[in-house]
């Protein structure tokens, strides 16, 4: 099985938790510690917000890695440095390096893809990485990083069956990317508890 087909075959293995992604990053030498990270979550608009933030950082002179999902045509769209998708030869080489560790840890598609992006950014010497949260926030693979900025675009009714059953429950999950003492931005027009992380 070719490397990309192997990665796609890991779809459907979703099981909430950060244990696998943290163990995978440890096996890879903690690439996520090589640069500052901004996490962008929310129900809608997080991809656009992540791309805009990456463009602002690039304009300011930073070498920027951008990780988004899903892709439109090509998987390589998800992992970009300076607006350019990861080259195919580098993608295949990193997948071959990642594969034995991901298999041993039974990592999911998104966990493996996230680790792949973080490793690529470290190898490419990025000065800042912008990561779009996949689903929710608290238990999302991107949340295995320690962000210097966390953004939640909004809190909506999408994915109530997974993150719900209420907007307050969704807000708690999305607020999971916030850290004490770390700048946080939120633009949530829907009613949200003032401190969703503390709501019973």
Identify the meaning behind each predicted range.
Residues 1-14:
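Charged, amphipathic alpha-helical linker segments immediately N-terminal to NTP-binding catalytic cores
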Residues 9-12, 26, 131, 152, ...:
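Redox-cofactor binding/interface segments in oxidoreductases and associated redox assembly factors
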Residues 40, 48-65:
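A conserved segment at the C-terminal end of the G1
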Residues 7, 43, 64, 130, ...:
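Residue-level signal for inorganic ion chemistry
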Residues 37:
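Walker A (P-loop) ATP-phosphate-binding motif of ABC ATPase nucleotide-binding domains
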Residues 134-139, 146-200:
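Conserved catalytic-core segment of NTP-binding enzymes
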Residues 14, 18-34, 59-145, 157, ...:
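ATP-dependent carboxylate-amine ligase catalytic core
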């Amino acid at each position: 099985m070719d490397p990309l087909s192997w990665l796609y075959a890991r779809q459907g293995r979703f099981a909430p938790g950060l244990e696998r992604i943290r163990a995978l990053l440890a096996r890879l030498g903690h690439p996520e510690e090589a640069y500052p990270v901004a996490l962008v979550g929310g129900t809608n608009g997080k991809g656009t917000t992540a791309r805009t933030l990456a463009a602002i950082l690039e304009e300011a002179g930073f070498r920027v890695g951008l990780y988004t999902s899903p892709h439109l045509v090509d998987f390589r769209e998800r992992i970009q440095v300076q607006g350019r998708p990861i080259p195919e030869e580098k993608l295949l080489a990193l997948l071959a390096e990642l594969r034995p560790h991901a298999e041993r840890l039974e990592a999911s598609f998104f966990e493996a893809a996230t680790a792949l992006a973080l490793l690529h950014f470290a190898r490419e010497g990025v000065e800042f990485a912008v990561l779009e949260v996949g689903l929710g926030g608290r238990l999302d693979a991107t949340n295995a990083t320690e962000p210097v900025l966390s953004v939640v675009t909004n809190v909506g009714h999408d994915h109530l069956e997974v993150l719900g059953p209420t907007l307050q429950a969704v807000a708690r999950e999305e607020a999971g990317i916030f850290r004490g003492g770390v700048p946080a931005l939120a633009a949530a027009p829907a009613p949200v508890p003032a401190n969703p992380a503390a709501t019973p």
